[in-house]
Amino acid sequence: NEVFKSDFPREYQTWTETAKTDFQSEFNGNVAVDVLEQRPEMVVLWAGYAFSKDYSTPRGHMHAIEDITATLRTGAPATATDGPQPSTCWTCKSPDVPRMMEAIGVDAFYNNKWGALGDEIVNPIGCADCHEPENMNLHISRPALIEAFERQGKDITKATPQEMRSLVCAQCHVEYYFKGDGKYLTFPWDKGFTVEDMEAYYDEAGFYDYIHKLSRTPILKAQHPDFEIAQMGIHGQRGVSCADCHMPYKSEGGVKFSDHHIQSPLAMID
């Protein structure tokens, strides 16, 4: 990320502000809050699933590597073949991910243990995740979103610049699952974006996230379907992008730029 600093100082400086942990609201903020302490019933609801061990509200992008490394959900693997989670869990955490996918192949990247790639995935979410380094155009750097569009008969390369201001976020801020033994990252959008559409998709595939330890019931746990909800809501219907509110334009010294301190819009209300 640091290589972009000299050419894009304003964007870089505001991006570093995602390290801040100084804002809270009723709808989260940038402070890690222990949700299991707030809502201990969730430990029972998630019995048998990794989230019953640890679940905190998210912090900013600069904490991505730190937080996934510290969470109890990824365990403490001692070797490259140890640990409870696949390397798929790295997918949205670093611009090192596309580099490794190109180096070893997408299938090999997913079909590995999380601990196996820890010495390669070291830079937090940053510039190259959303921008083409050669020209800084917005681009899609993760295959799962492209593949989800293809299964719906859509060509993501035809997206408008305004649509791209949301699609770069849709690489990660979505519902997803790890498909098959290869733990292949997949978005369940084939039938649509609604809860009912995704439930029908999962039912047809026979997929569930875990078997509840107490009731022995197969359970689906939604992840973070931010993009889907936005697209079905008034914002998506009116053509408002994620960046319009979460990365508003600013002016400094006569220069207009997008604020890369990606955060809750509630923190920016004058």
Feature annotation, model-predicted:
Residues 1-59, 102-124, 128-129, 133-244, ...:
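Primarily the internal scaffold of c-type cytochrome electron-transfer domains
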Residues 52, 59-87, 119:
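Long, charge-dense tracts
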Residues 71-81, 96-109:
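Long, mid-chain structured domain cores
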Residues 86-89, 96:
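Long, structured ligand/cofactor-binding scaffold of large enzymes
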Residues 89-92, 242:
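Short, thiol/selenol-centered motifs that function as redox-active sites or metal-ligating centers
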Residues 93-94, 132:
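Short loop/turn segments at strand-loop or loop-helix junctions that form parts
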